[in-house]
Regions:
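Non-catalytic, low-complexity flexible loops and terminal extensions
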Residues: 1-13, 19, 134-142, 146-160
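Short, exposed beta-strand "edge-strand" segments with a Pro/Gly-rich flavor and a Y/T-containing core
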Residues: 38, 82-85, 160
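Acyl-thioester-dependent condensation/acyltransferase catalytic cores
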Residues: 45-138, 142-145, 149-152
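N-terminal beta-alpha "docking/capping" segments at the starts of catalytic domains
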Residues: 1-41, 46
Length: 160
């Protein structure tokens, strides 16, 4: 991500409720969108990079201090990976979602979100798995909306 937002440092202590969610085994908020178009990994990565500019918690990782405090920080954050899985049947996304839901988040390295594209040339499913520490259902709906805007119009300006 090469933007002016990289320059700004963001840090705040994780709240008690957020800390509770960090230890909850099933704290993933999920959205699945069926896209009736050809979406490439490059197109999706570009859209993810753009939505990171608008959604601050997509630019943070969680660091654990010596005294056991958890903090959100924008320093040393790795890129959000986009996973692509070939789509063979229209129900493949169900199994991919189930497997993706079991995978642990790498809180110390990158934002607690995953994007999985179950890809075909005519129709694909985009699975977004986000830890409840950085999103809820409504914020994930807004994020998905913004992602679709940038998938549909890669040249669209980012509204901050």
């Amino acid at each position: 991500m090469n933007t002016q937002y990289e320059m700004l440092t963001y840090e705040r202590k994780v709240t008690g409720a957020e800390r509770f969610f960090s230890h909850a085994p099933f704290s993933t908020v999920t959205m699945v969108a069926r896209i009736k178009s050809d979406v490439t990994a490059e197109m999706l990565q570009n859209a993810v990079d753009k939505v990171q500019q608008r959604h601050a918690l997509l630019r943070v990782r969680i660091k654990d201090t010596q005294d056991g405090e958890l903090w959100f920080t924008s320093q040393g954050v790795q890129e959000i990976p986009v996973e692509v899985v070939p789509r063979k049947t229209e129900n493949d996304w169900i199994e991919v979602h189930a497997e993706g839901s079991k995978a642990a988040y790498d809180f110390e390295a990158r934002p607690a979100i995953r994007f999985i594209l179950v890809q075909d040339t005519d129709e694909s499913e985009l699975i977004i798995l986000c830890h409840h520490m950085i999103c809820d259902g409504m914020s994930l709906a807004y994020l998905a909306r913004d992602l679709m805007v940038h998938l549909g119009d890669p040249q669209a300006d980012v509204q901050v």
